[in-house]
Amino acid sequence: METTDWSALGFDYCKTDWNVRYSYTDGKWSPMEVTQDEYIKMHMSASCLHYGIELFEGLKAFRGVDGKVRLFRVADNARRLQSSAERLCLPVPSVEMIVDACVEVVKRNERFIPPYETGASLYLRPVMFGTTVGLGVKPAKEALLIVYCSPVGAYFKGGIKPIRVAVDREQDRAAPRGTGDVKVGGNYAASLLSGEKGHELGYSNIMYLDAAEHKYIEECGAANFFGIKDGKYITPKSPSVLPSITNMSLRQLARDMGLTVEERHIPVEELATFEECGACGTAAVISPIGFVYDMQTKAEYSYGEEVGKTCLELYTRLQDIQYGRAEDKYGWCTVVL
């Protein structure tokens, strides 16, 4: 990989050497299989192809300032994968299985881990789906769990920058008591139409409100939302919001900075009172929000063209832990190499 232009990497698939697989048949998981095959042979009547019995995860490995390679909160991603599997009535792999697979993938693909100074990282994608052959709607009795990886570039080229976001009440991300709190493919498929509408109008993301009343902020694109005001870090509390591992981390770092953390309903009109706000997730860590436009009420909320002080400090503190520049006092990182 000596000739790779790491700075040119985006967030896209890049072929690596190895992936790891487990199959579930006859009531038990197979031993780990390590393969270079990028393809899957699947029956046309496999349940995942017809009934959306599919889930995935996303996490990163970072080459640190000290040369060590760290996986960030891999056990938390494993536990969230278990929750998604339970929700879809899929067989539930153990945390140990998932963590072992992630560690193996990082070790096997060491040459694809970007150098420290590039700001890039190795993205891991665990994906699991039902493979039972049939026609009717029923839980899958066979499944496949794969973990693969791809090097990805820094989300913001040239430094963290605010994004433009639009509120759209005409599309909902997830129904109340639906699957919004688990990481399943259908949630993302359902967001594509409104996302494309927003992109056509010049917005990076759509801000989704609660599906029941369309009063409260839920998610921002495929990321959690948070707002900063009066010394508080405020983020939505809702059973249809995915529990973001990045948001969990930022809440702890906010407390470390002396902020009060509130998890509660956030009326969309409260956007007018925030000093800063942002979207957070694995891909970007934090995407500061510079402008919000409400498509239905025509209200506009502006937070400036530069990243706010609190967002920048939160971003820096988390990246410092991920890249080994700061003490990992909460034990979030697993040193792999």
Region annotations inferred by a language model:
Residues 1-105, 127, 134-337:
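Helix-start/capping segments and mature chain N-termini
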Residues 95-96, 105-119:
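Charged, gly/pro-rich active-site loop segments
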